[in-house]
Design a protein with these regions (language model features):
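Active-site rim/adjacent substrate-binding subdomains
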Residues: 1-141, 146-184
């Protein structure tokens, strides 16, 4: 089922999400709905707070980028109770433009670490403890930020935030257009 995307201004986007128990009701259906919602919105990542649930569940599908990133062919994963454990301080930082389904029409350059250590459960509730780098590390950080009550514009410079304040205000007030169902 395609769910509405919660946009900036919805309180759930500013809450720290809770870990869920492994017997969370209808988890597989929730993950399936998140994948369907993300695909219908032309996204590559979606966190549960973006659909109004303050729980630590994220889906990422990088297959649409596989023409530019062949290593992501067929890549789609769910992350249950994910946490960033550590950032590789020796790895370089990288700056790239980011956008977000919860901030329609806003794109800004964000600087992030290129290598992170994460722990999570997969869709079968199997534990993973791994270092992730490159573009996947960026997408994970963006989505995991939602679980901590942050959006990507929290990570831009105050000067850039000032320049886009009217766009942010418009999204916050529900004055925007996009091609997917939203809740503002």
């Amino acid at each position: 089922m395609i769910l509405p995307i919660y946009t900036l201004g919805q309180p759930v986007l500013r809450k720290v999400a809770e870990d869920i128990p492994t017997d969370y009701p209808n988890l597989q259906q929730l993950v399936a709905d998140m994948y369907e919602t993300m695909a219908a919105s032309d996204g590559i990542g979606l966190a549960a707070p973006q659909i109004g649930k303050s729980i630590r569940v994220v889906v990422i599908d990088l297959d649409p980028l596989s023409e530019d990133f062949p290593e992501y062919k067929g890549f789609h994963h769910a992350y249950i109770n994910p946490h960033i454990i550590e950032v590789d301080e020796n790895a370089p930082m990288a700056t790239m433009a980011e956008g977000c389904l919860s901030l329609p029409g806003i794109h800004e350059k964000v600087t992030r670490p290129t290598r992170i250590h994460v722990k999570y459960l997969d869709e079968e509730l199997q534990p993973h403890d791994e270092w992730v780098e490159g573009y996947l590390a960026r997408v994970m950080q963006h989505e995991f930020d939602h679980l901590e009550g942050h959006v990507f514009t929290d990570r831009i410079t105050p000067f850039r935030r000032q320049l886009i304040k009217n766009k942010l205000k418009a999204v916050n007030e529900g004055r925007f257009r996009c091609g997917y169902k939203t809740k503002s």
